[in-house]
Amino acid sequence: MSRYDLVERLNGTFRQIEQHLAALTDNLQQHSLLIARVFSLPQVTKEAEHAPLDTIEVTQHLGKEAETLALRHYRHLFIQQQSENRSSKAAVRLPGVLCYQVDNATQLDLENQIQRINQLKTTFEQMVTVESGLPSAARFEWVHRHLPGLITLNAYRTLTLINNPATIRFGWANKHIIKNLSRDEVLSQLKKSLASPRSVPPWTREQWQFKLEREYQDIAALPQQARLKIKRPVKVQPIARIWYKGQQKQVQHACPTPIIALINTDNGAGVPDIGGLENYDADNIQHRFKPQAQPLRLIIPRLHLYVAD
């Protein structure tokens, strides 16, 4: 497929996402809102977009106000829709839930509508990350050439739909991206970087090349069987824990956008019990269960690469 055809499909898919989101928000407003609870988080400024989040103050919104914020959030796709001071790199998050009363027919209609939106979002992400054939550093420029000001994460982010929950509880998750690597895999990656010299601020091209050579030597000095692990922290994120009474099970969802909960009164479902979201404080985290970590030694800080001792 030619680059021109891909761009045509990219634009066409994005326009469909916009149209279907507009139709969904209109459709939801035709349904009876049983309960709504969302939590706005402080906006991240451009100056603070790379700073660690040690505290997050939560503001709660209820009822129609919560619904208005949520429906606007689903369609928040461009930086032009937000304050000029707000970071375009930090994700815009609005945890919470909207609960609507449905019958069998309207439940199926909304399920199909949301499924279609999520399919389009997945297709759009696939075009950008895979079909474009571009490295991650080049994708930003390519996407914004065709869709100026797009917040790609918001375009990728799918909607979460749940049916007939009994209880919904919110909380915070501290996570790491974990990837196990062999010594030879890391050496191969470093070799590719060495073969494509470039400058990386604040280093000159020569300084960066010297830094890569030192890293290569450090890895090459390890035994071939050395166990290496990338353990990169991800910024704390809101989560929702859903309890289904009939199935006697709990399901946890990431909750960057309000969950849509359909309450089917044809099946005798009732309004769920919805909890709040506490302020986040990194110095006051309580772990339910924290297994003993494997001893690791940091070997390449910029890659968050560790070796198991």
Curated annotation (Swiss-Prot):
InterPro entries associated with the record: DNA_replication_term_site-bd, Tus_dom1, Tus_sf
Top-level taxon of origin: Bacteria
Name of this chain's protein: DNA replication terminus site-binding protein
Species whose genome carries this gene: Salmonella paratyphi B (strain ATCC BAA-1250 / SPB7)
Assigned GO CC terms: cytoplasm
Record-linked NCBIfam families: rep_term_tus
Keyword annotations: Cytoplasm, DNA replication, DNA-binding
Residues forming coiled coils: none
SUPFAM superfamilies documented for this protein: Replication terminator protein (Tus)
Family (UniProt): Belongs to the Tus family.
Record gene name: tus
Cited function: Trans-acting protein required for termination of DNA replication. Binds to DNA replication terminator sequences (terA to terF) to prevent the passage of replication forks. The termination efficiency will be affected by the affinity of this protein for the terminator sequence.
Cell compartment(s), UniProt: Cytoplasm
Entry GO MF terms: DNA binding
Lineage, opening ranks: Bacteria, Pseudomonadati, Pseudomonadota, Gammaproteobacteria, Enterobacterales
Listed GO biological process terms: DNA replication termination
